[in-house]
Amino acid sequence: MSKIIEIKDVSKVFSRGFFKKKHRVVLEDINLEISKGDRLVIVGESGMGKTTLARIMADLEKPSSGEVLWFGEDIHKIDKRRRKELRGKVQYVHQDPYASLHPAKTIYKIIADPLANAQRVNGKTLYQRTKDLLEKIGLVPAEYFFNKYPHHLSGGGRQRLAIARALTTDPEVIIADEPISMIDMSLRAAIIKLFKDLNDLYGIAVVLVLHDIGAAKYFTFEKGEIVVLYGGKIVEKGRGIRILENPAHPYTRVLINSSPIADPELARNRVLEQLRSYDVPIRTKESKGCPFAHACNYYTEKCKEEVPPLVTIEEGHQVACHVFGK
Amino acid sequence: MRKESLKNFYYDYIQPLLVNKKSLIGLIILTFFILMATVGPLIVPLDMTSNFAERYQKPSLKHPFGTDYFGVDIFQQIVHGSRSVISLTMLASFFAVLIGTVIGVARGYLEGIVGRAIDAIIMVFLVIPSFPALLILAAVFMNYNLNVVEIALLVAVWLWAPLAKQISAQVLSLKSKEFVEASKMLNMPLRYILFSDIAKLLIPYIFINFVMQIKGAMEFSVGLMFLGLAKFDPTHWGIMLNYALYQAGALYTAKGFHYIFFIILNIVLLIYGGILLSQGVEEVFNPRLRGNE
Amino acid sequence: MNYFVNRLLYLLVVFVIAISGVFVLVNNMPGDPAYGLAVYIAQQRNMQFEQALEIAHKMMGIDPHESVVTRYVKFMNNLLRGNFGYSTFYNTSVNEIIARALPWTLFVISLATFISFSIGIYLGAFAAQKRGKTIDTLISTLASIIQAIPPFILAVLILFVFSVRFRLLPLGGAYPVDMEPSLSISFIGKVLLHAVGPILAVAIPQMASWTLSMRGNTAQVMEEDFIRFAEMRGLADSVIASKYIRNNAMLPLVASLAIGIGYMLGGQTLVESIFNYPGIGFYFGKAIAVRDFGLLTGLFSLIVIGVIVATFVADFVYALIDPRVKLK
Amino acid sequence: MNSVLKKFIAIFVIVFFTAGIFAGCGQQTKPSQEATQETKPQETVKTGEIRLATDWPFPFHGNPFGPGGVGGAWWFVYEPFAYYIPQTGEYIPRLAESWKVEENKVTVNLRKDAKFSDGEPFTSKDVVNTVNFIQAMWQWPYDIESVEAPDDHTVVFNLSKTSSSSFVHTLLTDGAMASLAPVHVYKDFVDQAKEVADLGKKIFYLQTEGKPVPEDMKTEYEKKSDEFRKKVNDFAPFKTLGKLPVVGSFEPVKVTQSEMEMKANKYHWASSQMKIDRVIFKKWSSNEFVWASLISNEIDAAHPSMPKDVVEQLSTLNPKLHVLTVSDLSDISLVFNFKKPLFKDLNLRKAIAHILDRNKIRDVSVWQANSYENYADGILKSMESKWITQDTLQKLTKYNTDTAAAEEILKNAGYKKVGDTWQQPNGQPVAFTLSVYGPHNDWVLAAREVVQELNSFGFKVEMKLIPEGMRDQVMRSGDYDAAIEFGSAWWGYPHPLTGYQRLYDGDVSAITSFPAKDKYNTPWGELSPYDLVLELQKNLQDENKAMEIIQQLAYITNEYLPVIPLYEKVLPIYYNDGYRVTGWPSKEDPIWSLAPGGIERVYDLLITTGKLVPVK
Amino acid sequence: MSIIIRVEDLRAVYLVREGTIKAADGISLDILENSVTAIVGESASGKSTIIEAMTKTLPPNGRILSGRVLYKGKDLLTMREEELRKIRWKEIALVPQAAQQSLNPTMKVIEHFKDTVEAHGVRWSHSELIEKASEKLRMVRLNPEAVLNSYPLQLSGGMKQRVLIALALLLDPVVLILDEPTSALDVLTQAHIIQLLKELKKMLKITLIFVTHDIAVAAELADKVAVIYGGNLVEYNSTFQIFKNPLHPYTRGLINSIMAVNADMSKVKPIPGDPPSLLNPPSGCRFHPRCEYAMEICKKEKPKWIRLDGEAHVACHLYEEGRPLK
């Protein structure tokens, strides 16, 4: 029973309008698994469905179809109490630490309240555990921060605090949505490092949603998987370092090609691959073909008509592309 | 810990109000009136014996605000009347805020048909003009000897709706806030989310509204006395004003200027104090509220 | 469009509930419009009061034994046909009274709103742009003090100062009876002169509140990035003040403008009674005093309709002028 | 967005202007073209105008039977047979030239030169029709059994046997009897009116004779009278005819919510003497409004109650303003609810009579009023000497302000003062509420003073305002402890009978539930005031007998205190002399005593006799 | 290359409820004509303050305490408001950071162009305006017909950013200042904008100054890099030198913490600690609490702004008295 979360054929459709006629397919037939101690990165640009996927995994949103299993149980079929029990094991960290921390609560309260609730502790034990937790995620000395408010912290500090709060329930997996996008460059690595440490030292599975390929690489270069989303579909999936070094899907390639390089000489000499279109595709239930077809430089007629299946091109590397699929 | 949080509370909520000029002046004015209502009647005696020959005395040491049409000291009446003015006003504001908050929070949290129903109720109270409705209610309840609390409730019934609407909008936006979602993820109970997460951010907002309600409640309570709904209290400022304007015609005589002036001055000053305080509170707390939206 | 259909249906439900509430309220009001007449009859003709009351009821066309439900059905039925009921005191249909009174009230509140809105907007924007300076302190303090004055006190003071002390304004009425209503300059002048008192009584507190809201909104808009960007582009202060600050700060107020007019319909009772101005509020006050339940429910319904229409119009106007709402 | 906003504002401006224009046109009730184009009789052009204040129904229908009648225009529009000056007891003939009173029969000879304002002559047919109309519409006065018109200028009233002797006075002076329903205006209703009136009378006489009334007669009457009433109520001569033909001195020509314009009746019999041909009425919306109008010369005369300082101020601001007072033939009293056990104790009422400083109350309330210093005998102060003998006065208890006396009465009756508060013999505090009608300024002031004095004596009295429109209801339902009300009052007919009737068999007894039928101990034996009132009514013509009964009633009233009169109400009349009009009679002129119950009669009389003239 | 803007000892503060934020504390900087200068720093390090103070466009609570900004020999800070207004945009255009809120939400894009033109007394007919605006919009690869008649909220974040750049180019300015032109944008859009700026630089004779927290962006675009820390300028050098041989320990930490896609991930090293609060900045060198080379003197004395060989400037005690960094 090492599988923590399984996503089976999950799709998500957003509808709007009086008769719900206008709709938009945000996720399409997603299958994913997270097991104990895994590292997983979901990459893609905004509007590609990565946040929705993360929220569905964390049961913050319901899929339109498909199953979400936590520890082998379908979370939409089990009763409330069981779901509550399991929920503690799956935690979620928001993108924006400014918004996800209560602005009028002290740091002590932010950690101690959920801790007391989850661990049924109080008094001195609670105090000690809160202190330990804050120190664990690097807010030292903990007592110094107890009576401070979130706005006294830097972006990095706030994100640490949000992570610490997620740890109060002793989760087995933490899903973090763009945890570094609102944080300064110089502090980003430290946050990713923190996630790596949590994974290494405590065996907590970590799912990160990122658009920064560099950070994805940093997180997965030792171990872990990367999933690339485009237009609500998984276009490529596999071991992190493998994908980053040998991207198969044209989109992944462009993504890596476009990422900033911290070397002036290389940067100046590189040639950026241009896409045919930079629009975010809007898919409906009627849409056909590969979602990337409209932008892809390698598209064929087939791409417009047929949805490419996710095929394994190598051990631990799957891609969904008619051109590069073989 | 406790001492620390008290200190924090002071620095977060009290000290900024004392630093802000408007709220400071507002606080001073309100404190003055509250003192007048609580301690005042103990210090200042009230002699209502009329003395027609001594009417319309100009302000003097003996009569700081002069005497009224009956020859009774105006200052004494103002001091003693402040008790009923302030108790009714404060109670009505309190009830209005209470009802408004409870219904607003409920509306903000409840979705679907129940939410729409509450919405409709709020809307109903918004579209029925409050003053005429109160006139009718006054007549309906005329023969019940209502006490202050009941009258305050009656007034509050016509004051809470706008607040409820605003609060529900606030809660609607607050409940989709990420920190609320985080609390849900952490299995925090509903009461924690409502009373700790959401209520905490509503407090400054509610407070501002409480102060704003004072004005409405004040006007209503004066109106009610005019209408004979509230128990007749000759020193209630509204009644004093009624006597001055309509019974004694003080406006129409040069001698009576101070009579009207001091009553209006006190009414206006009290409301102005409330307005200042609420403006100050808004200045102090709203940026933070806005910043978190 | 769907949004509006939806909204309309919702307001209709609100309307029915509100009107029913009003009906119940009014019908629980103690007092019998025929009572005064009955006392008079009994005394004049030396007859039993009960008998006199019966006669009085007949004279006024009131059936005291009619059940509330029947009355309610009748009332709703009439309302559906646009008939607001019958006034026992004035012995005429409420529609006729509304036709007489509503134009005056609308005239006063629209003119008052127009004046107070234009001046309030200007003063508020001006004060906000001079934030912290003496003139700002002066304007906002004055506005706050005016807000603190209960409206009926203000009305009485205006009446006294302008009409009694300095005799600048005529006392009561909408125009002098010895003039023929026409579109002549002199007649319109008289109408305006008669309306000055009520208009001032409505406009002054309004102005204060517009000023304060506009000041707050302007201050908020001035912090917006697009204002600084406009400055960075070297735009003239006047252009920024009008096109960028004022327009954006005004938007929320324009919506409340429409709603405000709706609410004012119901708030005219005191002012119109004090100025003896023949508008809706005047009749409303009279209807309460003489327990004219027909007139009371009719006028109440009118006011509720006014507020609801205003709410609807406000939504519509807001969507019309704010692209942010329009495009959603 | 800018352009949209501009459009919005433009629409806004257009809307309010159209609203204004709509408001302007089609506002007033005014006669149609037809009326104004009518050829006018040749007349010398007069330019006199007087401005007054009063109330009237609006929209103006001009139907005296409709709700609100024609308001304050009444006495200008409907002339009675005669005016009665109470101070001199003189009848001034108006529509009647002369009259003859016989047993159950009054013959009135009508003025031959009376004409309606549309030129139609006024005849006895109009009077007959009017009487039928009132009887049909108001089910009153059934004192008139029948009315005949032997010729165009003679009317014979046959009175019923039960008719009271004061009815003749009513018949002659009541503005309703003569000209309410001119035949040429109400021509469609004439027969129906007679039918309904006759049927009503028939039923009434059967009832008074104690005979059974056939059910079908009753239903028939119900049906017919309802139908008739509905038809008449819906008839609005001012609207449908475009004019209101009147026999009185002035005809309303234009009416708005706030003003009413009346033009002189060119055909009026006194027309040649009238120097004023226009009356403008301003709406009497509140006393303050009338004060303001008087200061600014907006009106020429009015009779609002006004505090002393305001009068002084008014006189300095407007030196042309004069004031005089006449008795309003009524008094303001403290009335008790005898259903409450507290007030059943005469001792308490006596004590209250001693506690109150009635001069002070008068000062605060209506300073010009006559004060009752000592007695509470139910007779107006101004008339006391005329009706009460010295001998009787000797017998009456003097209720001078004397708290010691009050204390003694209470102590003797078993009341105790504990601390600051008086307790009843049963240990309950003496506590009650004093109700007073909110819109009556002077009453409220009086009530405040009463409450104040009683409280300083050691009672627990609270004041309660009765909201506008609720006075009759509250008082009738007995939902009060004590109240300020009219006490005994003369109203139209200045005779103590009216007052005692009110106290023991009328309005006041209806609201106080004073046990008037009980027997009370008097020097003349055990007497019941109720019986005395009936007896007085029967013996009105017999002056000696009447005087004797009045003495007895005065004694009972003074000793048993059904009410405590506070002051005799006066009518302060303010008039501007020399601004628009002049020629007001001196303050002593008895004509002023016509004012109570219809001050417009005074104005009408002054104008039609040519006394009031415009200022050059 | 000549100096086009010279900043001398610029000091600017913000007044807030809690006190004074010393956001720019003695900045001296020379900007070369037709060069691209990057100002790099963390959020709240004062980097935006520098460019806003330079153009006198600080927010209402900002105050310039001292310093000179010489543009073509004239001091912008003491210049009359009227004169300055003429220079703004026509010669020096500043594109603010908050591209998302920088357009009036109630005005169409075209009206912004119109306003700008009118403000500078340029008399173009309407068709001329459309033509010029379209030209600039095409330059930033936007479809003029669609964009000009749109309201800001109809545009995506990247589009708004490009509209602002087009607007900035409208009057062909000499100096273009961009505040965080790429932050909060997706990878592809970010690459796109960088590409665009590179092309603009080639196409137009323009001096480009931009502010960023991402030193990798500077690597791609800038000729020279100025590094700001805690309101102080700590290093100023050519881009190549900065990356090859970072002098200041902070610069070095910054480069080490970059998770660029081409970097050796095992060498990525986060900077410990948090950025300083500018309300109560640390004494002496503001970096000393986080500096691994900190000495006693660093706590007490503020390092001087010294010029080393070549173009290198640095403010660090390690280099004073010729102490070379080991």
Curated annotation (Swiss-Prot), chain E:
PROSITE patterns recorded: ABC_TRANSPORTER_1, ABC_TRANSPORTER_2
Subcellular location: Cell membrane
List of residues binding [4Fe-4S] cluster: C285, C291, C298, C316
One of the protein's GO biological processes: protein transport
This protein's UniProt keywords: 4Fe-4S, ATP-binding, Cell membrane, Iron, Iron-sulfur, Membrane, Metal-binding, Nucleotide-binding, Peptide transport, Protein transport, Translocase, Transport
InterPro entries noted in UniProt: AAA+_ATPase (IPR003593), ABC_transporter-like_ATP-bd (IPR003439), ABC_transporter-like_CS (IPR017871), Oligopep_ABC_C (IPR013563), P-loop_NTPase (IPR027417)
Disulfide-bond pairs as recorded: none
Reaction(s) the record says it catalyses: a dipeptide(out) + ATP + H2O = a dipeptide(in) + ADP + phosphate + H(+)
UniProt-listed Pfam families: ABC_tran, oligo_HPY
Notes on how activity is controlled: The C-terminal iron-sulfur cluster may stabilize the structure of the C-terminal loops and may function in the regulation of the transport process.
Gene3D superfamilies: P-loop containing nucleotide triphosphate hydrolases (3.40.50.300)
Gene Ontology molecular-function annotations: 4 iron, 4 sulfur cluster binding; ATP binding; ATP hydrolysis activity; metal ion binding
Function (record text): Part of the ABC transporter Dpp involved in dipeptide transport. Responsible for energy coupling to the transport system.
Family of this protein: Belongs to the ABC transporter superfamily.
Notes concerning its domains: Contains an N-terminal conserved nucleotide-binding domain and a C-terminal domain bound with a [4Fe-4S] cluster. The C-terminal domain forms a stable loop region and interacts with the N-terminal domain.
PANTHER family: MALTOSE ABC TRANSPORTER, ATP-BINDING PROTEIN, OLIGOPEPTIDE/DIPEPTIDE ABC TRANSPORTER, ATPASE SUBUNIT
Protein name: Dipeptide transport ATP-binding protein DppD
Gene from which this protein is expressed: dppD
